[in-house]
C-alpha cells in the first residue's frame, strides 16, 4: 500500500511516502528513525546525505507524521535572519492547541549566505526546546556551522550496504509497479522498470521523475528500454533537422530527448563539434552552456530543449 496525494499531479509529489515504514532506506537507517518515532518525541536533528534524491526531506516529513507533530516546513533559502526572528519565533513560542509537539523542518539549510541565520538559530533552539524541535536537511554537512551541529543529532544516511542495495532496489521496483498500476500505465516489459531503478540508484526522486517522462504515452515497452539503459545510438534525426532548419521537426523531437537531458546535451555538443566551422564551435558552446545552466529552473523541459534546437539551427554554420 502506498500513499497517494490526489491533489498533486507530479508523480514525485503525488506518491511521496508519508511514514517511515513506507520510506525506502538502508536497514540501519530505518531502524534509527523508527527508534526516534517510538519515543513519540523528535529531538533536534540534522539529516545529512551527500547524494540527492535519497529522501532527506521525505524522512523529515515522515518523522513528523509518525509522531503526529505540528509541523512547519521552511525552505532553507527563505530562512534569513528576519524570518527566524519573525515567523519561526512566532510558531515556536506559541503552544499547540492540542498539546502536540511542534517541529520546524528547515530544508537544505546548508546553502550559502545562511551563516547569520544559523548563528541566531543556536539561541533560538535553546530558548524554545521545551516546545519545539528543529529538523535540518543538508547535502553538505560543512555548510552547517559547528555550534549548530553540536546542538543537534547529526544523522548521515543513504549509505547502503550491498545487501541493502539489492533490497532497496527490489522495494523500488515494487513501488514503481504500484505507481504504474494506479496511473493506468501499462508495463509491457518489466526490464524497463528494473533498468530505471538500477540506472538512478540511490536517487529515487530522479527515478520517479524519469518514470513520469518515459510513461507519457501510457506504456513502458522495449522501445523505451534502449533509452533507459544508455543504448541510445545516434542522434542523426536531430542533426539532420538542425542542418535543414526544420523547426517543426525539431519541436517534435524535443520530447524524445528531454527525459535524459544531461546525456543528450553532452552528446549533442560532441556531435556538432566535428560538423561545424571553427567560428560556430565557440558559439555552439555558448548556446549549449547557457541552456544547460538554466535547465534546472525550466518550467517545461521540452520547450527548453526546443529553444536550444532553434538557437542552434539559426546560428550554426555547417561544414
From Swiss-Prot:
In terms of PANTHER family, this protein maps to: REPLICATION FACTOR C / DNA POLYMERASE III GAMMA-TAU SUBUNIT, REPLICATION FACTOR C SUBUNIT 4
Q: What enzyme class is recorded for this protein?
A: hydrolase
**Where, in this chain's numbering, is ATP bound?**
12-15, 24, 53-58, 205
Per its record, what are the GO molecular function terms?
ATP binding; ATP hydrolysis activity; DNA binding; DNA clamp loader activity
The cross-references to Pfam families, in alphabetical order and at most eight, read:
AAA, Gp44_C, Gp44_lid
- What HAMAP family does this protein map onto? T4_Clamp_Loader_L (MF_04162)
> What is the stated purpose of this protein?
Forms the sliding-clamp-loader together with the small subunit. Functions as an ATPase enzyme. The clamp loader holds the clamp in an open conformation and places it onto the DNA. 4 ATP molecules must bind to the sliding-clamp-loader before the latter can open the sliding clamp. ATP hydrolysis triggers the detachment of the sliding clamp from the sliding-clamp-loader, freeing the sliding clamp to track along DNA.
Give the protein's recorded name. Sliding-clamp-loader large subunit
Entry annotated with the keyword Zinc-finger? no
What is the taxonomic lineage of the source species? Viruses, Duplodnaviria, Heunggongvirae, Uroviricota, Caudoviricetes
SMART domains per record = AAA
Superkingdom is: Viruses
Q: How does it assemble?
A: The sliding-clamp-loader consists of 4 large subunits and 1 small subunit. Interacts with the sliding clamp; this interaction allows the sliding-clamp-loader to open the sliding clamp. Part of the replicase complex that includes the DNA polymerase, the polymerase clamp, the clamp loader complex, the single-stranded DNA binding protein, the primase, the helicase and the helicase assembly factor.
Give the species.
Enterobacteria phage T4 (Bacteriophage T4)
Amino acid at each position: 500500500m502506498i500513499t497517494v496525494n490526489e491533489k498533486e499531479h507530479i508523480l514525485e509529489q503525488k506518491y511521496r511516502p508519508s511514514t517511515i515504514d513506507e520510506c525506502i532506506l538502508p536497514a540501519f537507517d530505518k531502524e534509527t528513525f523508527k527508534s526516534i518515532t517510538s519515543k513519540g518525541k523528535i529531538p533536534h536533528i540534522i539529516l545529512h546525505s551527500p547524494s540527492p534524491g535519497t529522501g532527506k526531506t521525505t524522512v523529515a516529513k515522515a518523522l513528523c507524521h509518525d509522531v503526529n507533530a505540528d509541523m512547519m516546513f521552511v525552505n532553507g533559502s527563505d530562512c534569513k535572519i528576519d524570518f527566524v526572528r519573525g515567523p519561526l519565533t512566532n510558531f515556536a513560542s506559541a503552544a499547540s492547541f492540542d498539546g502536540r509537539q511542534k517541529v520546524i523542518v528547515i530544508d537544505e539549510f546548508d546553502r550559502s549566505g545562511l551563516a547569520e541565520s544559523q548563528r541566531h538559530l543556536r539561541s533560538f533552539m535553546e530558548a524554545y526546546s521545551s516546545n519545539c524541535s528543529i529538523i535540518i536537511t543538508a547535502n553538505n554537512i560543512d555548510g552547517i556551522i559547528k555550534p549548530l551541529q553540536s546542538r543537534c543529532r547529526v544523522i548521515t544516511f543513504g549509505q547502503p550496504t550491498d545487501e541493502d542495495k539489492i533490497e532497496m532496489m527490489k522495494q523500488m521496483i515494487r513501488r514503481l509497479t504500484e505507481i504504474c498500476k494506479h496511473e493506468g500505465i501499462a508495463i509491457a516489459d518489466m526490464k524497463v522498470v528494473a533498468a530505471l531503478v538500477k540506472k538512478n540508484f540511490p536517487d529515487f526522486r530522479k527515478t520517479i521523475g524519469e518514470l513520469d517522462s518515459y510513461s507519457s504515452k501510457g506504456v513502458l515497452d522495449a522501445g523505451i528500454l534502449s533509452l533507459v539503459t544508455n543504448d541510445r545510438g545516434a542522434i542523426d534525426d536531430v542533426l539532420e533537422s538542425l542542418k535543414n532548419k526544420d523547426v517543426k521537426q525539431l519541436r517534435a523531437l524535443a520530447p524524445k530527448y528531454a527525459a535524459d537531458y544531461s546525456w543528450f546535451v553532452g552528446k549533442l555538443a560532441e556531435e556538432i563539434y566535428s560538423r561545424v566551422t571553427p567560428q560556430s564551435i565557440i558559439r555552439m558552446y555558448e548556446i549549449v552552456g547557457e541552456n544547460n545552466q538554466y535547465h534546472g529552473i525550466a518550467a517545461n523541459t521540452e520547450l527548453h530543449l526546443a529553444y536550444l534546437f532553434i538557437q542552434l539551427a539559426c546560428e550554426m554554420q555547417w561544414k
